Amino acid sequence: MRVERVLLKDYTTLGVGGPAELWTVETREELKRATEAPYRVLGNGSNLLVLDEGVPERVIRLAGEFQTYDLKGWVGAGTLLPLLVQEAARAGLSGLEGLLGIPAQVGGAVKMNAGTRFGEMADALEAVEVFHDGAFHVYCPEELGFGYRKSHLPPGGIVTRVRLKLKERPKEEILRRMAEVDRARKGQPKRKSAGCAFKNPPGQSAGRLIDERGLKGLRVGDAMISLEHGNFIVNLGQARAKDVLELVRRVQEELPLELEWEVWP
């Protein structure tokens, strides 16, 4: 187990966030010790806005045994989702193609039920192991209340590993599906971002609504509504959380959109 003081901007895909005490745990016993005081769990740092003042709680990051995986067995929650998508395709296993390009770890993808219009994380789950109240518990997906970009984990629960529901398919078929998903994602920005900023209202596209209001290019400090896709806020270099929040406020003044990101603290 490694404990260090860090700036969370170096651990988030948006490149924003203040100081915290980072606990990197590699075993189940280390996880038990790390959770003996108030904590938060950090995955790959996407879909997350950390305030400039940082967080007072321990920030736990899963490594070691939590990054091991068996596509036909248990997959550690610290495993990168893009890696799994590619490995499944190489093995001729279908079920993850719709998650192509999502820069999350498995645990974070489960917690927020990450997905695209081609599929979501809950679709690929057979079982989920969650650590809470000092013990490890296994749940079937139906017990975790998955919905659009959300789940209902037990309070303080940490996803530790999952079993995937994959089916054998011809590799050519899987690759065609992945190419279709990849084409649909081509309009997304290359600059630092936390992923889609706002949830899509039922039957509508948040990005299109933002575009129609002429909000693309709206900027506060180094935080800007992407010119490439209206539902992305990008960091032009030195953006701070306060800049991002002000940009969110201005969008929400114009449109009744719900923020998709988690905000710390």
Curated annotation (Swiss-Prot):
Its domain of life reads Bacteria
Query: What is its pathway?
Result: Cell wall biogenesis; peptidoglycan biosynthesis
SUPFAM superfamilies in alphabetical order? FAD-binding/transporter-associated domain-like, Uridine diphospho-N-Acetylenolpyruvylglucosamine reductase, MurB, C-terminal domain
**Looking at the record, which segments are called Disordered?**
182-203
For the keyword Nuclease, the answer is: no
PROSITE patterns according to UniProt: FAD_PCMH (PS51387)
Q: Name one GO cellular component term.
A: cytosol
Matching InterPro entries: FAD-bd_PCMH, FAD-bd_PCMH-like_sf, FAD-bd_PCMH_sub1, FAD-bd_PCMH_sub2, MurB, MurB_C, MurB_C_sf, Oxid_FAD_bind_N
Which positions form S-S bridges? none
Gene Ontology molecular function terms on file: FAD binding; UDP-N-acetylmuramate dehydrogenase activity
Q: Which UniProt keywords apply?
A: Cell cycle, Cell division, Cell shape, Cell wall biogenesis/degradation, Cytoplasm, FAD, Flavoprotein, NADP, Oxidoreductase, Peptidoglycan synthesis
**Gene3D superfamilies registered for this protein in UniProt:** 3.30.465.10, UDP-N-acetylenolpyruvoylglucosamine reductase, C-terminal domain, Uridine Diphospho-n-acetylenolpyruvylglucosamine Reductase, domain 2
Entry cofactors: FAD
The record's active-site residues are: 149, 196
Catalytic activity, EC: 1.3.1.98
> Which reaction is catalysed here?
UDP-N-acetyl-alpha-D-muramate + NADP(+) = UDP-N-acetyl-3-O-(1-carboxyvinyl)-alpha-D-glucosamine + NADPH + H(+)
Look up the record and give one Gene Ontology term from the biological process aspect: cell wall organization
Q: Where in the cell is it found?
A: Cytoplasm
What Pfam families does the database record attribute to this sequence?
FAD_binding_4, MurB_C
**Domain annotation FAD-binding PCMH-type: ranges:** 15-169
Q: What does this protein do?
A: Cell wall formation.
The record's listing under NCBIfam families reads:
murB, PRK14651.1
Membership in a protein family:
Belongs to the MurB family.
Please give the name of this protein: UDP-N-acetylenolpyruvoylglucosamine reductase
